[in-house]
């Protein structure tokens, strides 16, 4: 399944938006338009559904309800999220999940549910608050989604949310993970424990994935070959990626992740994540640190890998090269436009001018990206 529709009210940048989604989506917009915050709604649902998480955990991780609530919210301050999961494009939703959150007016001002609703194949199977919730209001500080004893009727949906993965790999954190002390962000979004994650994968699966990644790497970095994973016993079992770098000597030189370029590490992280699971994958600017020629191949590569594994991919981007691929449909691009009353979200296919440009032979990138440039951006060149 994949998320086919999302409706947000008072979520961060978005006062009220609705978006139809495909298995592959590219999210574009100006800086601070809310691209990362749009992805964060799915991370929030993951934080609710995962073991050890929950509604209170997800809100606390984001600094409370106030930072989550849209600044444009006025008379109706509740935060509301609705998502639909479908088996295929155009199919009726297999699942629908709705949640409304508000804050206590007095006391410790704890966030609680104004409602929680679930539909399966069009039939409503959960509608909170229930009578027991009215008798014990503390129950509304937890969702049924997060509780094993209450989510059995929609556990497949809960598992989908639990499997959501976010990746914005920071190469320096991969290279020097042991030098950064402290627990780090929940869910390891920046790849500090990326090598540990590879190490926890069963050996047969790990070797198979690394072999596939090696094939892709040799196309992008012809000098690299024989990508392997190892733990250095001399260093106390620290995990490493290692590859042979071809040069004038007959056997090349062995290099570890500390010698890999930023682009190589980010490409390894991207490919591993695409091969790793079958739930939603959230990518933050996958084009970073990569050569323009490689970036042009990302969209078709993502399509081929996700099609095999049924994985939905949502990616933010500023890259004209990434969006230059002729295989990207306007239905796969969301344009975020900041406005006085919150960011507006519109499908590129719903913009008449974009459709006309595509009909004239332009790429999605050429048709959409100029709309993301702020009106006064050219004046930056006059700054002194």
Question: What is each stretch, according to the model?
Answer:
Residues 1-15:
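N-terminal pre-Walker A segment at the start of P-loop NTPase domains
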Residues 1-2, 297-384:
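C-terminal lobe/lid and adjacent interdomain/linker elements of RecA-like ASCE P-loop ATPase modules
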Residues 10, 83-90, 120, 245-249, ...:
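Short acidic, glycine-rich loop/turn motifs
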Residues 18-20:
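ABC ATPase nucleotide-binding domain
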Residues 23-62, 190-193, 267-273, 291, ...:
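Phosphate-binding glycine-rich loops of NTP-binding sites
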Residues 40-106:
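Conserved P-loop NTP-binding catalytic core
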Residues 89-228:
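Electropositive, glycine-dotted interaction segments
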Residues 210, 215-218, 225-275, 280-293:
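Conserved ABC ATPase signature
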């Amino acid at each position: 399944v994949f998320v086919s529709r999302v409706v947000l009210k008072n979520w961060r940048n978005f006062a009220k938006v609705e978006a139809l989604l495909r298995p592959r989506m590219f999210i574009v917009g100006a800086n601070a338009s809310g691209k990362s915050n749009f992805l964060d709604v799915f991370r929030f649902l993951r934080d609710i559904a995962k073991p050890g998480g929950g509604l209170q955990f997800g809100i606390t991780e984001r600094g409370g309800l106030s930072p989550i609530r849209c600044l444009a919210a006025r008379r109706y301050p509740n935060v509301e999220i609705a998502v639909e999961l479908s088996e295929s494009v155009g199919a009726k939703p297999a699942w629908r999940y709705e949640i409304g959150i508000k804050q206590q007016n007095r006391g410790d001002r704890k966030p609680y549910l104004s409602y929680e609703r679930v539909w399966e194949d069009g039939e409503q199977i959960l509608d909170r608050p229930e009578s027991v919730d009215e008798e014990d209001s503390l129950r509304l500080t937890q969702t049924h989604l997060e509780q094993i004893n209450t989510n059995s009727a929609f556990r497949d949906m809960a598992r989908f949310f639990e499997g959501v993965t976010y990746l914005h790999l920071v190469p320096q954190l991969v290279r020097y993970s042991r030098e950064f002390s402290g627990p780090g962000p929940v869910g390891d979004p920046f790849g500090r424990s990326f090598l540990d994650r590879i190490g926890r994968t069963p050996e047969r699966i790990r070797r198979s994935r690394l072999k596939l990644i090696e094939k892709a790497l040799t196309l992008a970095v012809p000098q690299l070959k024989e990508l392997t994973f190892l733990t250095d016993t001399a260093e106390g079992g620290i995990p490493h990626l290692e590859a042979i770098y071809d040069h004038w000597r007959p056997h090349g030189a062995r290099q570890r992740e500390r010698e890999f370029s930023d682009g190589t590490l980010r490409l390894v992280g991207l490919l591993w994540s695409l091969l790793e699971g079958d739930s939603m994958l959230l990518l933050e600017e996958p084009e970073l640190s990569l050569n323009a020629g490689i970036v042009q191949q990302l969209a078709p590569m993502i399509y081929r890998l996700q099609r095999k594994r049924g994985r939905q991919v949502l990616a933010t981007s500023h890259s004209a090269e990434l969006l230059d691929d002729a295989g990207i449909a306007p239905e796969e691009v969301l344009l975020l436009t900041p406005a006085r009353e919150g960011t507006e979200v519109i499908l590129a296919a719903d913009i008449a001018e974009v459709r006309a440009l595509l009909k004239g032979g332009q790429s999605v990138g050429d048709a959409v990206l100029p709309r993301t440039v702020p009106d006064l951006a050219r004046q930056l060149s006059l700054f002194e």
